[in-house]
Design a protein with these regions (language model features):
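Binding/recognition "hotspot" determinant
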Residues: 1-72
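Long, low-complexity, intrinsically disordered extramembrane tails
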Residues: 1-3, 283-289
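Alpha-helical transmembrane segments
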Residues: 208-225, 252-253, 284-287
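Hydrophobic transmembrane alpha-helix segments characteristic of membrane transport
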Residues: 72-108, 203-217
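Hydrophobic, aromatic-rich alpha-helical transmembrane segments
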Residues: 60-64, 95-99, 103, 165, ...
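Non-cytosolic segments of integral membrane proteins
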Residues: 16, 20, 24, 106-203, ...
Length: 289
């Protein structure tokens, strides 16, 4: 009877150990893949990231938004002229320099609107150069491997009782689902930022048309700050990955399999949290809202 009981226990142990090893073997693959893509994704300009989307957005900006920007420009510069006249005591203290000043500001406004796309892309080219320079300094190769953290994994599992094995099997199953969810979160942050960039750049001529007006100029200035925040968010993301790489690189070899699994997951949750915070942090630095 004891022989049969032991045979059943050994059979269940082999099944649980096989299931745990199977769960652990690909536990961090999806997350490692997403993390490895981050440096390349955030270091790419809108033109290089997806040429078809870029061309579509530029076409919309030039053919749909630019005429609207022309109307906005005419309105704000007319408003500027009226304000200049009112400030000069309703033409009683008028001088010719006032009109030269208005003509100069209008010419600058037209120059800004007609070169909006070059200005916007210049911001992201600047951000790309910063990210590429930082990528050469920071550690961005971050890969989790449970076998490097827990030595002699299979032999340790075979020495465990059925109860702890069943609990560990359930933990690996749960952590596996969580790691898939975290990899999706990383995907959302990285790709969502690029979609946001395309959305913001598509309407660029309208806020840029307000730049030279005293009252409406804050719209254009805040738009530029938003562009800088989006551009330098890539730098923040790269720093997050570098910190994550340093943290997992310092994970010590552990005898506790459960502790090792949850530690790796904890660092990945921390990475996702900081990636989501990178947008608000960049906007607060540049006072964009």
């Amino acid at each position: 009877m004891d022989v049969i009981k032991q045979a059943i226990v050994d059979w269940l142990r082999e099944i649980l150990v096989g299931g745990i090893i199977s769960n652990l073997s690909g536990l961090y693959d999806s997350t490692n893949t997403r993390v490895a893509e981050i440096a390349g994704q955030v270091g790419t300009t809108p033109a290089a990231w997806n040429s078809s989307i870029y061309n579509m957005i530029r076409s919309l900006s030039d053919n749909v938004i630019l005429p609207i920007a022309g109307v906005v420009l005419a309105f704000v510069m007319t408003l500027e002229l009226i304000q200049l006249i009112v400030d000069r005591n309703n033409m009683h203290d008028v001088d010719t320099w006032m009109f030269f000043k208005w003509i100069f500001k209008t010419a600058c406004a037209v120059l800004i609107v007609t070169n909006t796309w070059n200005i916007v892309m210049g911001v992201f080219d600047l951000a790309q150069s910063v990210v590429n320079s930082a990528a050469g300094v920071t550690i961005t190769q971050a890969s989790l491997d449970i076998s490097s953290i827990v030595t002699d994994l299979e032999s340790r599992l075979m020495d465990m009782e059925l109860g702890p094995l069943f609990g560990l099997w359930f933990q690996t199953l749960f952590v596996g689902v969580c790691m898939w969810a975290l990899s999706i979160c990383i995907f959302i942050v990285v790709y969502g930022r690029m979609v946001e960039i395309y959305l913001v750049t598509s309407v660029a001529p309208v806020p840029m048309a307000t730049m030279m007006n005293r009252e409406w100029g804050q719209t254009g200035q805040n738009y530029l700050r938003s562009l800088l925040a989006l551009g330098f968010q890539a730098f923040m993301i790269l720093v997050c990955v570098a910190i994550y790489a340093a943290l997992i690189g310092n994970i010590t070899v552990s005898d506790d399999i459960s502790y090792a699994i949850w530690t790796c997951m904890g660092y990945t949750v921390l990475l996702c949290f900081t990636l989501f915070k990178s947008s608000s942090l960049a906007k607060s630095i540049f006072h964009a809202h």
